[in-house]
């Protein structure tokens, strides 16, 4: 079966409801916590480490929920939301490759913030480069990621880790 190489917003919302590829597919967050508007390209081949990649985008506008509360008089997108978006994309990649279960962020080796996302920005771009994919009893992905705002790199994350779990009771 040939897998789809890009996804629009309505498909990502369907993923959050368990309707994209069924309930076993790892779901994305819904509503305000979905930090992705579209997946531009996803591939299990190529990339910087030869293990695959995913490129995605988020459109920025001054009405996004976080600008009203982070911070009053000094609106900026919380850096943790950009980091979470990268974890969301690693989990989505694992499901897209056939992994099943509930996605959980397992950590990150290093994160550097060198810029910010303001309400005047237009577009955030996510660049995720898979380094390792384990598809056994434990499904896990390790990736490096970058966040760019209007083409300028502002966050870099090394060794983003996401696992898929069929049972999260004792997680």
UniProtKB/Swiss-Prot annotation:
InterPro entries: FabA, FabA_FabZ, HotDog_dom_sf. It is found in: Cytoplasm. The keyword Ubl conjugation does not apply. The keyword Lipid metabolism applies. GO terms for cellular component: cytoplasm. The active site is at 70. It holds the Pfam family FabA. Signal peptide: none annotated. Keywords: Cytoplasm, Fatty acid biosynthesis, Fatty acid metabolism, Isomerase, Lipid biosynthesis, Lipid metabolism, Lyase. Homodimer. This is 3-hydroxydecanoyl-[acyl-carrier-protein] dehydratase. It comes from Photobacterium profundum (strain SS9). The gene is fabA.
């Amino acid at each position: 079966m040939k897998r789809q190489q890009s996804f629009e917003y309505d498909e990502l919302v369907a993923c959050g409801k368990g309707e994209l590829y069924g309930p076993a597919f790892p779901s994305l967050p819904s509503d305000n916590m979905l930090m992705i508007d579209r997946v531009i390209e996803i591939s299990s081949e190529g990339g910087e480490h030869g293990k695959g990649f995913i490129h995605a985008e988020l459109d920025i506008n001054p009405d996004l929920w976080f600008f009203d509360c982070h911070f009053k008089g000094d609106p900026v997108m919380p850096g943790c939301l950009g980091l979470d978006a990268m974890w969301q994309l690693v989990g989505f990649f694992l499901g897209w490759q056939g992994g099943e279960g509930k996605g959980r962020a397992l950590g990150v080796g290093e994160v550097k913030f060198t810029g910010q996302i303001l309400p005047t920005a237009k577009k955030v771009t996510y660049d995720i480069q898979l380094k390792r994919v384990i598809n056994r009893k434990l499904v896990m992905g390790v990736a490096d990621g970058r966040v760019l705002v209007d083409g300028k790199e502002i966050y870099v994350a090394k060794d983003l880790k996401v696992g898929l779990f069929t049972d999260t009771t004792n997680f």
